[in-house]
Amino acid sequence: MARSCVTDPRWRELVALYRYDWIAAADVLFGKTPTWQQDEIIESTQQDGSWTSVTSGHGTGKSDMTSIIAILFIMFFPGARVILVANKRQQVLDGIFKYIKSNWATAVSRFPWLSKYFILTETSFFEVTGKGVWTILIKSCRPGNEEALAGEHADHLLYIIDEASGVSDKAFSVITGALTGKDNRILLLSQPTRPSGYFYDSHHRLAIRPGNPDGLFTAIILNSEESPLVDAKFIRAKLAEYGGRDNPMYMIKVRGEFPKSQDGFLLGRDEVERATRRKVKIAKGWGWVACVDVAGGTGRDKSVINIMMVSGQRNKRRVINYRMLEYTDVTETQLAAKIFAECNPERFPNITIAIDGDGLGKSTADLMYERYGITVQRIRWGKKMHSREDKSLYFDMRAFANIQAAEAVKSGRMRLDKGAATIEEASKIPVGINSAGQWKVMSKEDMKKKLNLHSPDHWDTYCFAMLANYVPQDEVLSVEDEAQVDEALAWLNE
């Protein structure tokens, strides 16, 4: 029969030395010297009955140090329970639990006898005589499943809530309702993605501070700018990407602060009007792009063709409106004919035609190929972004395109047409940051229902231009080249 670690004098010596000195324990057991920021988390969490809430930017090492906290709590307190909570179970496995595995490997290499008493599996960590009781567990708190968090009780209990900003108030009600013991602790960790909810309150009305000495939480901010683990090059890159320290995304993902304002309109009217008068210098290798928004649904009654000069990619993209065409009450067949007539490659060499690829836009795109042999680029901006980084920043391609277009306006890389419709639409695009920390543009249905705003057909074409690929207008294409372009576009449109 397995013996408990409490019978081993070596374990008792570790407890005597490090139960209340986790900073030293991190060094001795795991070979990790915590940064001054990580020290703050450790010093708060190692206190009996502590309630700690941490906002953090990228790269501060919070997941690594949290894994060490979880292991030490289990090691030093007989019968202890650590509950790792997140909206998705896989989120914990990919984050904190990954570090538990690597740090535990270091600990047993330094103190091999520990492996006799503590068992690590793919999804749990427990004392050999206390499986299911003296243990680290993972629980999901996805909406509708909050009651699964109930039933946790122990003399020494630690809840660790990952990405806490996205956890529902109902889940927190269940969790905090279990913290009835003298040494029941809670540690919240997250980027500060939304200015509401329990996690937000833990840094404001529930936080211990000079004006609120009876608050519940020790609130800690980990700013990536101040972390010795974050290279200055990363900070410079994020400043350039987000456009300044006060940009909401920079505040959330770098400074670890709740943004001053995250909901409102994408652009102000003065910014839009300046963009109609601005002189934008196009880069070498620019190409012609015609973006088409097809009327249909959500109160729309106009189709728009926007012919533009385009150069560069992403935050280097420059866009100059050349011609804006608007049509009322035209059929898909009529619109396809107008696109073919207006986007003449003899006048606009190598012009790329991009059409919204859903709804009636799909029919128009099909007609362009069936009647005129033209393969258009279909904009499917309801789809998700491709890279992990982009997925973390943008809810979908529509959000990416709108944010990129707005940044182009603000930084002087886009010239808009002077039409009243464009000015009105561009200055009334409702945008915000959701609980996952992603930019999200209000749906067109909600724009109409909540704000009585019509579909921004003209502005949408400028957003399409941030997604469209183009061919330099002075590039000579052979028949084989054109076939390759058509093949590539067909692949993109799948």
From Swiss-Prot:
Quote the record's binding site residues for Mg(2+) 2: D293, D356
Annotated cofactor note: Binds 2 Mg(2+) ions per subunit.
Q: Which domain of life is it from?
A: Viruses
Q: Where is the active site?
A: E163
Give residues annotated as binding Mg(2+) 1: D293, D446
EC number(s): the record gives 3.1.-.-
Q: Where is this motif: Walker B motif?
A: 158-163
Where is motif Walker A motif found?
A: 56-63
Example GO molecular function term?
Answer: ATP binding
Q: Which UniProt keywords apply?
A: ATP-binding, Endonuclease, Hydrolase, Magnesium, Metal-binding, Nuclease, Nucleotide-binding, Viral genome packaging, Viral release from host cell
The residues listed in the UniProt record as binding ATP, with positions renumbered to this chain, are A26, D27, V28, L29, F30, G31, K32, T33
Cofactor dependence is on:
Mg(2+)
Q: How does it assemble?
A: Interacts with pacA protein.
Q: Tell me which family the UniProt entry assigns to this protein.
A: Belongs to the punalikevirus large terminase family.
- Briefly state the protein's biological role: Component of the molecular motor that translocates genomic DNA in empty capsid during DNA packaging. Heterooligomerize with small terminase protein to be docked on capsid portal protein. Forms a ring-like structure through which genomic DNA is translocated into the capsid. May have or induce an endonuclease activity to cleave the genome concatemer after encapsidation.
Protein name, UniProt field: Probable terminase, large subunit
Organism of provenance: Escherichia phage P1 (Bacteriophage P1)
Taxonomic path: Viruses, Duplodnaviria, Heunggongvirae, Uroviricota, Caudoviricetes
As recorded in Swiss-Prot or TrEMBL, the protein's gene is named pacB
